[in-house]
């Protein structure tokens, strides 16, 4: 962080958020290369090598493009001529791709510095991978069992491009950068619409920047109001809807209730709220009454409609009662399960039986949606009956077997945190039988004859992996009694959703 801050010491421009001069600074490209700002892009950096065009280029080309843009406006080309205009051996699509990535890299610098400064002085567990999707579930296991309601919110996206420009104005102060951003944004949409039929690969870094800036502005307002409502221990939700002199009103409001209704004061305390954002959605978990949850719901609707000028319907905010409803969360169906327990209490010569209830987070596999995904990819029918994969019969036996084993292991790895493994075993069974039918079809034989000829050793690859590893971790007596069926294990190396989750 100190080295990144040293790069940006130029005439106080960093303090004023003047980013446009950075387009002409050579060390910015060195910073992008040395400090790994291109990690958000799963491909290689566009400043080093572009796999689509197989060309290498440097910051000098970027400077020439910007100068030419101001001199003759030749970058503003009609959509139908996008592939016909060449400059330095590249098409105009290459210009937009390169400049949009450059803009994203430069604007990421103050965001990265601000994010890094917020983490200074805070300690995180080294073994806790915050990038992993599965890192959310241990947190929810500890917290959701104490709550009863969850708001499931679909985060809307701005329809008009000027909303994104206005959002960036709060972060970037110089007009040159804003004008340049507006130009990149509109031209980017022009060639995106032209190439959408050809399924061209869009610039993921620029899209991630737009998404993160939009989300950052929304969450900054939400967390500000959430923090304000937590300053006073005994407050009501009036602070979120009527902010004028709310401290005086709340104090007077509490004074009345303390004098007249002391027994009800505990019901007015601001509950503890947990907020989690994932995959274009966010959830708000709290222990509230239905009335207060409805207030939170319409608060989100008014926030998006009034502040961001985005049409946001109340149907996009679902109120789930965890004890009755299932919450679709990252490919799992989560709910609260009540486990009744009987505790025997002994007091001198008298003994009592106490009924107790233990609340646990139940994570289940949505078997119906996964079967639809498998049926869509021709692994089984819509009823879950395995069929042969006809398109793979041209491959070798080892390739076919390796493909099925890889898919089966990925699914087992992702859904290792399910409370009950019955549905997971069913998915494995479908893939195993589909593999056998595919191999039997290739060799023009029946499944029974094929297995009889090769033996059961063919499917041993499916069995090696998670089950055998877990049998080594836990004691043999633990594994012998099949308690492993209820063990949930969350892997902290999963960074992306499983393909079968995105069945929609």
From Swiss-Prot:
Subcellular location: Plastid, Chloroplast
Keywords linked to the UniProt accession: Chloroplast, mRNA processing, Plastid, RNA-binding, tRNA processing
Cellular component terms (Gene Ontology): chloroplast
GO BP term, pick one: mRNA processing
One Pfam family matching this protein: MatK_N
InterPro entries in the cross-refs: Domain_X, Maturase_MatK, Maturase_MatK_N
This protein's record includes keyword Lipid metabolism: no
One function term, GO molecular function aspect: RNA binding
Homology family: Belongs to the intron maturase 2 family. MatK subfamily.
Function: Usually encoded in the trnK tRNA gene intron. Probably assists in splicing its own and other chloroplast group II introns.
UniProt protein name: Maturase K
Native source species: Lepidium campestre (Field pepperwort)
Origin organism lineage: Eukaryota, Viridiplantae, Streptophyta, Embryophyta, Tracheophyta
Gene that this sequence comes from: matK
């Amino acid at each position: 962080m100190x080295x990144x801050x040293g790069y940006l010491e130029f005439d106080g421009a960093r303090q004023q958020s003047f980013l446009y001069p950075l387009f002409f600074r050579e060390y910015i490209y060195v910073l992008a290369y040395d400090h790994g700002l291109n990690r958000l892009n799963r491909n290689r950096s566009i400043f080093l090598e572009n796999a689509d065009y197989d060309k290498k280029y440097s910051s000098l080309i970027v400077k020439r493009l910007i100068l030419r843009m101001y001199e003759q406006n030749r970058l503003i080309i009609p959509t139908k001529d996008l592939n016909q205009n060449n400059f330095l051996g590249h098409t105009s699509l290459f210009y937009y791709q390169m400049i949009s990535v450059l803009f994203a890299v430069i604007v990421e610098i103050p965001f990265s510095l601000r994010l890094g400064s917020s983490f200074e002085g805070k300690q995180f567990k080294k073994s806790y991978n915050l990038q992993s999707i599965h890192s959310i579930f241990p947190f929810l296991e500890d917290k959701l069992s104490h709550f009863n309601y969850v708001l499931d919110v679909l985060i809307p996206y701005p329809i008009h491009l000027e909303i994104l420009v206005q959002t960036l104005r709060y972060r970037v102060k110089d007009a040159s950068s804003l004008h340049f951003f507006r130009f990149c944004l509109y031209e980017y949409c022009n060639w995106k619409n032209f190439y959408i039929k050809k399924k061209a690969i869009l610039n993921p870094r620029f899209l991630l920047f737009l998404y993160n800036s939009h989300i950052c502005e929304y969450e900054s307002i939400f967390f500000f109001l959430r923090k304000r409502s937590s300053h006073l221990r005994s407050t009501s939700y009036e602070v979120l809807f009527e902010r004028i002199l709310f401290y005086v009103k709340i104090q007077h409001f509490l004074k009345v209730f303390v004098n007249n209704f002391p027994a009800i004061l505990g019901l007015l305390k601001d509950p503890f709220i947990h907020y989690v954002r994932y995959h274009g959605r966010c959830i708000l978990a709290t222990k509230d009454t239905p009335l207060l949850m409805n207030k939170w719901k319409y608060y989100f609707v008014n926030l998006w409609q009034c502040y961001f000028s985005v049409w946001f319907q109340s149907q996009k905010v679902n109120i789930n009662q965890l004890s009755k409803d299932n919450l679709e969360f990252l490919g799992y169906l989560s709910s609260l399960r009540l486990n009744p327990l009987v505790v025997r209490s002994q007091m001198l010569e008298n003994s009592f039986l106490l009924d107790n209830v233990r609340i646990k987070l139940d994570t289940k596999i949505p078997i119906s949606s996964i079967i639809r995904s498998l049926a869509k990819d021709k692994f089984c029918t819509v009823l879950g009956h395995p069929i042969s994969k006809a398109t793979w019969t041209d491959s070798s036996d080892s390739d076919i077997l390796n493909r099925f084993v890889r898919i089966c292991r990925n699914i087992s790895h992702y859904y290792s945190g399910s409370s009950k493994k019955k549905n997971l075993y069913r998915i494995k069974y479908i893939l195993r039988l589909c593999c056998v039918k595919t191999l039997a079809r290739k060799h023009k034989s029946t499944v029974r004859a094929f297995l009889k000829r090769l033996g059961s050793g063919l499917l041993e690859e499916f069995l090696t992996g998670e089950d055998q590893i877990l049998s080594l971790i836990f004691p043999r007596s633990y594994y012998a009694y099949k308690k492993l069926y209820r063990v949930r294990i969350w892997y902290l190396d999963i960074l992306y959703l499983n393909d079968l989750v995105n069945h929609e």
